[in-house]
Every structure is written in structure tokens, then in C-alpha cells.
Amino acid sequence: MNRNPANVSALTADWAWANPDGESWLTRDSQPAPKAKVRVIEGDGARRLGHEAKWDLLSPFLKQHGREGIAYATLQEGMEYFIAETGYIAYTRVQHPLLARRPKRIAFSDPICAPEDLPDLIRSFLDRDRRAAFCVISEPCAEVLRPMGFKVNCIGYEPLIPIQTYNTQGNWKELDLIRRARNETRRGGITIREEHEAGLSLRREELEALSAKWVASKKINDREIWLYARRPVFDHEKGVRKFVAYDHQHRVAGFAFYDPMYRDGKVFGYSANIVRCDEQRFGRLATALHMEAMEKFKSEGKESLNLLLAPFGKLDCGHFNDDWGAKLFFKLSARFG
């Protein structure tokens, strides 16, 4: 997924449909959006918002309702915002000379609000842009969107690991991958530790170099796929946990950054939003990083680790596959890459 809407549209549910009778686009949902104060931040205004300013503005909603794995990522650079009294919607605008001559708003993730406020917040957003679309949303959010005229398709699933009961040491039966990862780190003299602002600053050049090497090793290596796997930030970010792996020569071998997931003002789990390793030298290091982080989170009483979107996986398990063309495209993508 990227800023090319030819790609984005294949992964989103675009509700804009033909209406030969000329009826209002709200006809499909008979409940009009209530009038409420809203704030729209786009363009230069959005670009000028730093992390601290975004946190001050949006964290009251995020800390109460940021329960999804990519909720925290709505604070990242490049997002624009529709903010109401009950919550906010983060989105990006895309444009294409043929497919979207006018900028098209692609809402990123579930709206950040209480479940009961979701319909009205979405209606209010659509009241200002009926061409908007949504991507990487949960099934409860999809259930709200479908009566409004959206088509919805499953694009994958998010693996959720129960932190308190999961065997982070592995075994040679069901969890041999974990055991092998643990053994690899021991043989390689790998040390994994959580780093804070000072440690990140000291290792910034190494972290950036490893990140660039990781991107270069991928099939799509000319840009970051930043919407559902955000760009790494090698500075302090409120609530984000950052674990770094070092080889026996004390060089950076990999890192994993975990975004907090919030419920009712408290962190109940984390999402593995950024994981990058020297895969040529340490093929199982990402697993070892996750297990080390989970042990720390377990001691703190956290509940869940979200490994985030596995694109095109378990498509038939999704409740919604409204567009057969999109479903076929996703299945072909899963098969042929």
C-alpha cells in the first residue's frame, strides 16, 4: 500500500457508487449526522504538527479508545486529521491523473472513538467528503460502514498473542521456531535490551543503516510501505517500547519497536509495528526479539501482543468479501506475491 491510488484502491472499500436517481448519498443510511464542532487539519497545517503537538491534541482520544494495533500509528508523519468532539479520523489524500483527478481521502485505520460514537463520527466525516474510503479497518468498523453503502473485503488478519499464557521459551514440538530462534541468538552471542532516548541517540547511525539495508532487501525497495507498517522513529515517542539486538561485537543486528494499545486510559498491550533485522546473518532474530519483549510485558501485566496485518492471509475467514474482483486480486497476490 502506498500513495499510488491504483494500489491503494485495491486494498480499500470505496463506497462511491452510481446513483441514477440522483438521491442523496445519505439515502442508504436514514440517520443524518448530528451537527457538531469539527476541526480539519490538512496540508501545511498537518505537516507542521510535530509528535508532541499531535500527542497533546489527540492523546485524550487515543488513550481512551486506541485499542487497535495501528491506532498509535495515526500519530505518524504524513497523516491528516478530521477531529470531532467524540474522536478523530486519520487519513491521507491520494491523487492520480486517471483514477483520482481530485484528491481522494483514504481514512487510515478505525476511527479513534468509543464504539457507540463510531456511526456518527463516520457520517460527519462523509458529510464533508462523500468520496472517502477506508483501509485496514476492523470487522466491527466494517459492520458500521456497509449500511452506508461501502463494499468491504477482507485483506488479511492480525495474529494476536496472549502475553500472560504464551510459552516464550519454545519447545521442540509445537513451538520449535521459538526454540530455534533462542538457540540462534545464544550461538551468535546476541544481546537484546530495551533502549531509551540516550541509547537510541548513541546508535542512531547504526539503526538507520540497518533499516536502509532491510528496505533494500525487499521486493518493493524504493519506498517505505508506511500506512500499515509505519516508518521507524529513532527518538523518544511517548509510550513506545524500543528493543535493540546487538551482536557479539556490540553492533546493531536488529530492532523491534512496539506501539501501545490503549483501553480506558491504560495500556493493555502492544503492537509490533516496526521489526527490522539483519536477516542474512540472523534469520530468526525477529522471533527472539518478540519473545524477549513479551517477557518484559508479561512482568508488567500486559495482555496482548499484536503482530499486525498479515496481508492476504486467511482471506476466506473474513466475514466480508463483497467485491469478487478485489477478492480474486487478493488471492492472486497471496499466491504469486
Q: For the regions a protein language model found, what residue spans apply to each?
A:
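Short active-site oxyanion
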Residues: D129-A133
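Glycine-rich phosphate-binding "P-loop"
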Residues: R105-P115
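Short hydrophobic short-linear motifs embedded
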Residues: L11, V38-G43
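A conserved beta-strand-loop-helix scaffold within acyl/acetyltransferase catalytic domains
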Residues: I41-I106, C135-I155, Y166-R180, E184-D323
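Acidic, Ser/Thr-rich peripheral helices and adjacent loops at domain boundaries
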Residues: C317-G337
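Inter-domain linker/hinge segments that demarcate the starts of reverse transcriptase
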Residues: L121-I122
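An acidic, glycine-rich, mixed-charge low-complexity segment common to nucleic-acid enzymes
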Residues: S9-D29
